[in-house]
């Protein structure tokens, strides 16, 4: 049996100790087959726990194989008699009882195993073999399934992707050869969907959020005050905020696509699940969220005396959520489990978010405008983010995604971002130089985070070093920027010399192209450490000795192709072709026979082998020690590295927006601030284009359109046939607004854009099967949300209201909603509709204007112009659209007759009068 390898502060076996071969003496292979049979008859060996199998094969018995079957009590760790289990399984059950809501992977030799119901579960989930293990003579067989330790990352990634948490129990000591004594094992890692830091488990261009929620007592029916705190453990970002109403809470949760949500009680879990059953929650100790424990946790984590400096003094709900989150992270932190205080989850100081700081885009609007994914297929390609992301680094891509999630309301910050884009557009050399720097830049945010947690590989540290070496070049670029630019650029203007010294130190100590795993050696440069150099000299000497020994044995045996080779199980051996066996000298000891090869050892080789292993093990240990010293130095600079990395990410995002602007002819919009005076509110876009559709069109030019909002034109009634471009146009307005408020240039010829506080959309609707709501009820719920939350500074985009009920009911609702938006809320609104009767609103309201999508009809053919012009349409061309869609001619002809009859007998248009 091989000696077990130890994983030191590393889940995926990148820091093994070198394995040593079993040096036990071998029995000479000099007994014939007949002699062996006689020997077995003299001393028969008894098979254990298989009496029924013996009976079956010796006596042709059909008796049941009871001991080979898994009985019902042995299926679950909860029902098995723990005291009757083997020591290893008893330990497994103890750990499983402490982690009942997580999958426990238990290291046995070269495998991580699951037992009982976990084994059945992962065998189905991962499609791996389900087998069994003897749990003791009174228990019998129990289910077992496992994965090889070297493939752990791949399988863990699959489990995490399916929203399961994993507990890793590893071996904490190496085998001593006394196989009667179980090795010491313990939990070395708890991995949850929201706390992974391994590259293979993360989406490079997305944040991986873990969110804690605290709900206070409801202040009125269904109106809870809440606090949420979310962190990306891999990048160190930490955000917290407060709010009211469950709907706003879910907007925040769903918008960020959080990977894991923790709450303090089952009551809160039940309340939230009643609102949305598609989100999974983890319930942790309720005390984590108490104000006293939360405050103490926050102070201890950030090593501060007061919360005032964090801005949390009067934010009790946010404080409780933050305390609950930090407490949870400390509980599952691997450094606590390994008693190593040098390793920890490193988070930045919390950034408090207030609604007044950002444009609010609820989940429904994100979905309707296809901001990050398409509405129908949920694909990235075809989204707004897809259309503008030209970033070179993963850091920049995540930064751009965060900006789109939370566009700015601060006009100064918007203008400063625009200024950097202008700098890039005005200088091709500036663009090219920055591209060359960023093109090979590593993900400094996550790389430094892995170093802080003790999981960075040698290649990770080299990537950090290479990234830090580029800082002086970035500094020179930032100094060339004209105009007023954001304050975060100071991180690049004032580079910490210690970071550059750290980069040089990494390059001095680590080789440029290190192996993937530390167990392979060859990480540290020669000349770095005298002890390591001395050990390497000895290794070279032993290598020379082996070469000389090979030449000597060739000469003695006269076998020219003889080789001395190494096998991890057998150690060093002499290998010869089987045809040369007759030339083997007498001092060779036969080790192994293969099909075409014979293997031997000599006393000299075996004696020297132990010394070789001793030196190699010492060298490997010294090399790992030196590597850890470098990694700890990087860990100490994690916060500083991340500060610089965030500035680099912003530069990358803005460079990408500049490239997008150049490629797609975007222009710099003029931005005006929010104002409470409707007379001063104005948005004017000339030649606006839909940034998504324009890039998807490959064989024709996109038709641009204008839009104007002012005190005389707050509500636009947009009419026109189906498939004429109404939905594309209203989405276009929302997308241009978002681009303007993230500081981007926009697809237009000219744009003067007023900042808005929220964007609301109601575009299309389907039945909500999870809540049992019909299409019409979903539509009305969305409409109610808009009417109750919109302000005069909001942008409202409506595509049909009042469908799914009778014509007169629908028209009445659409009319009333339109008038409420124009008279009561007085916000910028586009209402696309087939109710042509709404064109009459212009005559009774001074801030309503009618627009239509132009079409041309020649004989029986309909041509869509996709051009928006003043005036209301008087025909929907629904029958013509149906004809284009391929509806049978017979149905079309009948529809024409019915329409003619209805138009002649419907006096609604003539009779409609609104007081």
Swiss-Prot record:
The keyword RNA-binding does not apply. Keywords: ATP-binding, DNA damage, DNA repair, DNA-binding, Nucleotide-binding. One of its GO terms (molecular function) is mismatched DNA binding. One of its GO terms (cellular component) is cytosol. CDD domains: ABC_MutS1. Residues 18-66 are annotated as: Disordered. GO terms for biological process: mismatch repair. Residues 49-62 have a biased composition (Polar residues). InterPro entries: DNA_mismatch_repair_MutS, DNA_mismatch_repair_MutS-lik_N, DNA_mismatch_repair_MutS/MSH, DNA_mismatch_repair_MutS_C, DNA_mismatch_repair_MutS_clamp, DNA_mismatch_repair_MutS_core, DNA_mismatch_repair_MutS_N, DNA_mismatch_repair_MutS_sf. ATP binds at residues 720-727. This protein is involved in the repair of mismatches in DNA. It is possible that it carries out the mismatch recognition step. This protein has a weak ATPase activity. PANTHER family: DNA MISMATCH REPAIR PROTEIN MSH1, MITOCHONDRIAL (PTHR11361:SF34), DNA MISMATCH REPAIR PROTEIN MUTS FAMILY MEMBER (PTHR11361). Belongs to the DNA mismatch repair MutS family. This is DNA mismatch repair protein MutS. The gene is mutS.
